[in-house]
Amino acid sequence: MNIFNISPAVLIPRLLALIISLTFHEYSHAWMAVKFGDETPRWAGRLTLNPLKHLDPIGSLTLLLVGFGWAKPVPVNPYTLKRKHPAALMAVALSGPLSNFILAVVTAIPLRFALVQPIGTTSSLLPSLFEFLLYFMYINLRSEERRVGKKCRYRRAPY
């Protein structure tokens, strides 16, 4: 993704895709943590769909410029989860990428059933959102340092 060679008709849908997906992704982490009993995201003001609480300005700009970026991570305290099972933290970690997959499927439905016809670059919101969400899900599942995949990779079953 090179922001300097993109028309406004393509840039605006990408910005919308970025805002929607990063916000929903981080909200999903916060919601799942609260469901498992950790009130840290609520106390930090992260249990909201307000994009200003979730978007990191530098990470968002980097995502637009080079295709790799980040949002503000949701604080989660694994010691306050009601279930001390390793799957609880794994569920919190996987809720973000799962939310990206759900958003990708939801945006693909109108395209699949021809409810929305993309015409040139002026109607590129849904294809851009779909591609962005799948890419974002892939990046989050990679087992790199400080990524979601690493948290899940080292969790062991209790048996």
Residue ranges and their predicted role:
Residues M1-R155:
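Hydrophobic transmembrane alpha-helices and their immediate loop junctions
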